[in-house]
């Protein structure tokens, strides 16, 4: 017998019995199910509820539009999570409103499915829990007032609800102390193997009684099907009843960290010869492949055939292998030794621990509901669940390793070398910086400039890959920068076009190379920060360049051998001609003062040269003379302004220089240039300390030019005209010209010996 508190005079009291879940053994129930204990409602509140429901029925006569079942599924309830917003808040002011809302929602369900409202009290003396019987697969039938059942409500075993549970107990004790020792009694039916707890709602306060017996039926510990949350209020289709029941039972298996009775299972009461369990494993759907281990099921769909382990939910393409009995026994022993029987309070037992702690047995009702939910589920949910599990399982099992993928895609050539780098940008360089002895310092300055200058992070101009990580690959005589994400080539540079490369002096992970841009044709020094010492990149480049030089040397040797073979055959082809080897032009620079230019009448003559020098010196002041640089090369004499190196004042080809000499003053030097159309110009210069060096340089350029002309047209290839008569005027003039040229050459040789010509 349970005690009932008397209600206040102004408010009716609704007394509801709820089965206790504190000591319920979920997985070890072999006795037949018994209906829950019932209690007559002693108040007239049900009549008010019936009136409200009838009033609502007149308004909402048309059922709502049909919805898909998966839209009505409570995701949090299916996953075993608690919704704090969905927990009932029982109070004095909200009890009547909540009951009316529950009645309206159940009326909509009855109108759509043509069934009786499971939560509506049919009469003050007859209350039937239709929902509980429907979940058990039974047909509802009316009973007398003493055996009518009320929907058992079990509190959710979550941390937040347990706190609320404790608050309700505290408030109930205070209410009991305030009201005194007024108690009411209620009759209840119970069996010897079951224990119950009563829940009494009076004036909106909840009082939980302690269980009278240590064990109770699992049916009494089912989760309540009527909730105050909006998701659970919605109607559920008939085809989803088994699925919902299975989900509620699975959620019911989640152990509580506050109640040790839920985590400590009794192995003594397990019946290995339970008829329900044998019926489950002998079902035809699980016997499609008798060679499969227990718990495995073969599933075939459009994607192929795969195997599903029902207790754990894992899927795999490979066929599972049965474990021998001796291994299974050893495995059970090891698991039981690892997992202690008294579970700590701060730990939760997974599904597999329930099976292990219970001797490998799981309650037959749980298997029935789980089997019903998996064999005949909603088609849309089944298709979605299968595809999701299959995709996740295959992704986790067959996903390729990223390192292997990178190595396969990048190192396609076994001789290719890959380095992880990050671009720091580039700096423009001048041609003079790459001269021998200067290139090393210039490259190191570029590395320092880009390594230590902290520019704006958004300024990524000239930085390959916007400063992100990339791969520097040396493959097939090419230096390539590759994006590690999509393998796109950001930049490629032929190794033979790289002028200089080097490693930073301050940081051994800085690498730089200098090459000419293929579009702008300017020299750029590209700098990179490497993940590994940059010496490896420099060594690899050196090896590649050595290989290229060796290949070119071999090709040249083959070409020479082919030329010798052709010479032996006496083939008169142009390839047999020995061309002069080109050499770098030697330029001599002199700092002089430019007096100016004066037109003259004749191209040669010392008197004409001296006359032009005197005229320019008398007509101009020394302050007006320009400081210039005279560059004397083999083919050109160039006069450039000293202030602006890009300003060319005079440019005279040596082939057009007709006369040169030193004036009466040893500081003066002048030359006459033929501009064409019988026009001649005399350019005058003032030299310090004297004009000897300048005159010798120009003289050497003239001699070199003359010898090049002789080499270009040797005497053997000249077309010789017929010799004139011995007494003709032409022969006498030709002889005089030859003598004059030879005497001029002899005079120049006496002044300065000519260097050996190439």
Swiss-Prot record:
Residues 290-322 form the WW domain. Gene3D superfamilies: 2.20.70.10, Pleckstrin-homology domain (PH domain)/Phosphotyrosine-binding domain (PTB). Widely expressed. Residues 212-230, 261-275, 331-340 have a biased composition (Polar residues). One of its GO terms (cellular component) is lamellipodium. Residues 413-578, 584-736 form the PID domain. It comes from the Eukaryota. One of its GO terms (molecular function) is molecular adaptor activity. Residues 134-154, 176-195, 206-295, 326-351 are annotated as: Disordered. The keyword Repeat applies. PROSITE patterns: PID, WW_DOMAIN_1, WW_DOMAIN_2. The modification Phosphoserine is found at residues 123, 160, 334, 409, 412. Residues 176-190 have a biased composition (Basic and acidic residues). PANTHER family: AMYLOID BETA A4 PRECURSOR PROTEIN-BINDING FAMILY B (PTHR14058), AMYLOID BETA PRECURSOR PROTEIN BINDING FAMILY B MEMBER 2 (PTHR14058:SF11). Plays a role in the maintenance of lens transparency, and may also play a role in muscle cell strength. Involved in hippocampal neurite branching and neuromuscular junction formation, as a result plays a role in spatial memory functioning. Activates transcription of APP. Interacts (via C-terminus) with APP (via C-terminus). Interacts with APLP2 (via cytoplasmic domain). This is Amyloid beta precursor protein binding family B member 2. The lineage of its organism: Eukaryota, Metazoa, Chordata, Craniata, Vertebrata.
């Amino acid at each position: 017998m349970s005690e009932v508190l008397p209600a206040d005079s102004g408010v009716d009291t609704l007394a509801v019995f709820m089965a206790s879940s504190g000591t319920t053994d979920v997985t070890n129930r072999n006795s037949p199910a018994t209906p829950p204990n019932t209690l007559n409602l002693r108040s007239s509140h049900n009549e008010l509820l019936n009136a409200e429901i009838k009033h609502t029925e007149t308004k909402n006569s048309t059922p709502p539009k049909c919805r898909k079942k998966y839209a009505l599924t409570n995701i949090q309830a299916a996953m075993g999570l608690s919704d704090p917003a969905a927990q009932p808040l029982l109070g004095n002011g909200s009890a009547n409103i909540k009951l009316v809302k529950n009645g309206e929602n159940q009326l909509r369900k009855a109108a759509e499915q043509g069934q009786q409202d499971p939560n509506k009290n049919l009469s003050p003396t007859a209350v039937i829990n239709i929902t509980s019987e429907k979940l058990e697969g039974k047909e509802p039938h009316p009973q007398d007032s003493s055996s009518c059942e009320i929907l058992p409500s079990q509190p959710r075993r979550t941390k937040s609800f347990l706190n609320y549970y404790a608050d309700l107990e505290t408030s109930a004790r205070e209410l009991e102390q305030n009201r005194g020792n007024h108690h009411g009694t209620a009759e209840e039916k119970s069996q010897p193997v079951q224990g119950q707890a009563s829940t009494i709602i009076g004036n909106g306060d909840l009082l939980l009684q302690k269980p009278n017996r240590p064990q109770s039926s699992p049916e009494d510990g089912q989760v309540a099907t009527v909730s105050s949350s909006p998701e659970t209020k919605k109607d559920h289709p008939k085809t989803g009843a088994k699925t919902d029941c299975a989900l509620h039972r699975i959620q019911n298996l989640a152990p509580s960290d506050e109640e040790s009775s839920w985590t400590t299972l009794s192995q003594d009461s397990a019946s290995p010869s339970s008829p329900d369990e044998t019926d489950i494993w002998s079902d035809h759907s699980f016997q499609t492949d008798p060679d499969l281990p227990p718990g495995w099921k073969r599933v075939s769909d459009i994607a192929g055939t795969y195997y599903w382990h029902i207790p754990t939910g894992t899927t795999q393409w490979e066929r599972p292998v049965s474990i021998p009995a001796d291994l299974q026994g050893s495995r059970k022993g090891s698991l039981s030794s690892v997992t202690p029987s008294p579970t700590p309070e701060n730990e939760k037992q997974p599904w597999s621990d329930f099976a292990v702690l219970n001797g490998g047995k799981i309650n037959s009702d749980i298997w029935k509901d789980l089997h019903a939910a998996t064999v005949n589920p909603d088609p849309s949910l089944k298709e979605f669940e299968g595809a999701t599990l299959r995709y996740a399982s295959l992704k986790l099992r067959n996903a390729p390793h990223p390192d292997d993928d990178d190595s396969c895609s990048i190192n396609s050539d076994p001789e290719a070398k890959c380095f992880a780098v990050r671009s720091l940008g580039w700096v423009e360089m001048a041609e003079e910086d790459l001269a021998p002895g200067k290139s090393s310092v210039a490259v190191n300055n570029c590395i320092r400039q880009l390594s230590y200058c902290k520019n704006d992070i958004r300024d990524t101009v000239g930085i390959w890959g916007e400063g992100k990580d990339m791969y520097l690959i040396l493959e097939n005589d090419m230096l390539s920068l590759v994006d590690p994400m999509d393998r796109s080539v950001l930049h490629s540079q032929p190794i033979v076009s790289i002028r200089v490369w080097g490693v930073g002096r301050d940081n051994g992970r800085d690498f730089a190379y200098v090459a000419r841009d293929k579009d702008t044709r300017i020299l750029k020094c590209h700098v990179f920060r490497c993940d590994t010492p940059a010496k490896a990149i420099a060594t690899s480049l050196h090896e590649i360049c050595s290989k290229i030089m060796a290949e070119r040397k071999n090709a040249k040797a083959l070409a020479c051998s082919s030329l010798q073979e052709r010479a032996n055959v006496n083939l008169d082809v142009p390839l047999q001609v020995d061309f002069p080897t080109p050499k770098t032009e030697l330029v001599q620079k002199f700092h002089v003062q430019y007096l100016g230019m004066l037109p003259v009448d004749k191209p040669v003559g010392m008197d004409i040269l001296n006359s032009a020098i005197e005229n320019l010196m008398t007509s101009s002041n020394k302050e007006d003379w320009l400081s210039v640089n005279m560059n004397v090369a083999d083919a050109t004499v160039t006069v450039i302004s000293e202030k602006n190196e890009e300003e060319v004042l005079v440019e005279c080809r040596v082939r057009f220089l007709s006369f040169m000499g030193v004036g009466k003053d040893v500081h003066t030097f002048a030359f006459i240039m033929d501009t064409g159309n019988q026009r001649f110009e005399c350019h005058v210069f003032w030299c310090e300390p004297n004009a000897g060096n300048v005159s010798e340089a120009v003289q050497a350029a003239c001699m070199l030019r003359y010898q090049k002309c002789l080499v270009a047209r040797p005497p053997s290839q000249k077309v010789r005209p017929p010799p004139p008569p011995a007494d003709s005027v032409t022969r006498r003039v030709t002889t005089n010209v030859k003598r004059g040229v030879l005497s001029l050459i002899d005079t120049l040789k006496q002044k300065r010996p000519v260097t050996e010509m190439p």
